[in-house]
Amino acid sequence: MRLAIGLLMVGQLAAAEATVIRGRTVPLTQLPSGPSQSRLAVVFLPGDGGWRGTAITIARNIASWGFDVFGFDTKKYLEVFSADGERLTTKELASDMRAVAEQVAGMPNRPVVLVGWSQGASMAVAAAAGLHARTPIHGVIALGLPQSGVLGWDWKATLAVVAHREPDQPAFAVRPLLSASSPVPLWFIHGSEDEYTALDTARSLFRSAGEPKHMEEIQGANHRFEGHQSELFQALQRGLSWITTH
């Protein structure tokens, strides 16, 4: 079996898990919706900052709406596959994300929605591209989708982000993947003041996507949606509801 999950309970609010992908361990955190398993599961893919801060806040809010949420540490994933000069391919990244979705879906399979933010959004789109059937991935919600996603991460990349520079890492283009995403429903959420991907660029990416799709713009919001989390959460709720009807 190419992917397995081991569970270690760390408290009532969340469970820390380890997901083994092609022999390498990547942190996963489950935030259950309640005493019973929810009908739909969400895999939350944060940005290159990993599983911390705002990413956890967003995931906890989604769980509070009655969804089982699994927070995948995108930064750690990229780091463990960048060891010794290695780099992922786009095909490997997409396959890995699909494997995580399949494991989270469980048996019998339940629908899974990938909610990605920034780098995580590019990874969610990659996972959806080229699927001939939606199961188990029934939809993607992309927050602050960039034009490209990276295929590796190291300490120099972290310093580049702090300095507001592009990390010197191999990357993949998002636009061609968007056109290959149909029939998986795509819900875009973008801040009008996003400092990494301009709104006009985000609109252009949206036009490249296959149907069904929908885009919501949050006026005044930056890439982190600071000061606009209420609007963000409302848009997320609408997106999850919309995906369940498609």
List where the protein language model places each region.
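Primarily recognizes the serine-hydrolase "nucleophile elbow" in alpha/beta-hydrolase
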Residues: 103-162, 169
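Catalytic active-site module of serine/aspartate enzymes centered on a nucleophile-bearing elbow/loop
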Residues: 229-246
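Conserved alpha/beta-hydrolase
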Residues: 62-81
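Catalytic histidine-centered segment of alpha/beta-hydrolase-like enzymes
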Residues: 221-231
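Conserved alpha/beta-hydrolase "acid-adjacent" motif
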Residues: 195-201
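Short beta-strand/loop motif that positions the catalytic acidic residue
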Residues: 181-182, 188-190
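Alpha/beta-hydrolase active-site loop
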Residues: 85-106
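Short beta-strand element of the alpha/beta-hydrolase
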Residues: 39-47
